């Protein structure tokens, strides 16, 4: 049986409006959990260094844990020339929406299937070609 253990909530900067800020979990441990905890040595604490045993979360260093979000935001002008930027802004704008892109792919795929089926020769299907060889008799001499 699993037992729940109540821990003290950690104050994390930036989570003041979060649902986990400052709420305590009121749980009474079961008698089996209490008896198990008395058998264990109480002097040892579980500690893992950053990166050791696949622990990569540090509440004291949130910026390095979650990543530098401001690193990739840039207000610099576009590295492309004006004509190229205008072309992509004009002709690629309809494909920024998922629905329009899906419609374009469906219409393009449907027209490709229609073209291939219209240009295919009609005698590709075996039912149109008919038998090519005389029938071979089976094990009892029957067709």
Swiss-Prot record:
<dbReference type="GO" id="GO:0009535">
    <property type="term" value="C:chloroplast thylakoid membrane"/>
</dbReference>
<protein>
    <recommendedName>
        <fullName>Photosystem I reaction center subunit VI, chloroplastic</fullName>
    </recommendedName>
</protein>
<keyword id="KW-0934">Plastid</keyword>
<keyword id="KW-0809">Transit peptide</keyword>
<keyword id="KW-0472">Membrane</keyword>
<keyword id="KW-0150">Chloroplast</keyword>
<feature type="transmembrane region" description="Helical">
    <location>
        <begin position="100"/>
        <end position="120"/>
    </location>
</feature>
<dbReference type="GO" id="GO:0015979">
    <property type="term" value="P:photosynthesis"/>
</dbReference>
<keyword id="KW-0812">Transmembrane</keyword>
<dbReference type="InterPro" id="IPR004928">
    <property type="entry name" value="PSI_PsaH"/>
</dbReference>
<keyword id="KW-1133">Transmembrane helix</keyword>
<feature type="transit peptide" description="Chloroplast">
    <location>
        <begin position="1"/>
        <end position="48"/>
    </location>
</feature>
<comment type="similarity">
    <text>Belongs to the psaH family.</text>
</comment>
<dbReference type="Pfam" id="PF03244">
    <property type="entry name" value="PSI_PsaH"/>
</dbReference>
<comment type="function">
    <text>Possible role could be the docking of the LHC I antenna complex to the core complex.</text>
</comment>
<keyword id="KW-0793">Thylakoid</keyword>
<dbReference type="GO" id="GO:0009538">
    <property type="term" value="C:photosystem I reaction center"/>
</dbReference>
<keyword id="KW-0603">Photosystem I</keyword>
<keyword id="KW-0602">Photosynthesis</keyword>
């Amino acid at each position: 049986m699993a037992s729940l253990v109540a821990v003290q909530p950690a104050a994390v900067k930036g989570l003041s409006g979060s649902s986990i800020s400052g709420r305590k979990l009121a749980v009474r441990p079961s008698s089996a959990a209490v008896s198990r905890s008395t058998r264990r040595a109480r002097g040892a604490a579980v500690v893992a260094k950053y990166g050791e045993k696949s622990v990569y979360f540090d509440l004291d260093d949130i910026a390095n844990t979650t990543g530098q979000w401001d690193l990739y935001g840039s207000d610099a002008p576009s590295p492309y020339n004006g004509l190229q930027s205008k072309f992509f802004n004009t002709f690629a704008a309809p494909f920024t929406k998922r629905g329009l892109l899906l419609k374009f792919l469906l219409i393009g795929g449907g027209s490709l299937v229609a073209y291939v089926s219209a240009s295919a020769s009609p005698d590709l299907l075996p039912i149109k070609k008919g038998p090519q060889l005389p029938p071979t008799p089976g094990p009892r001499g029957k067709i």
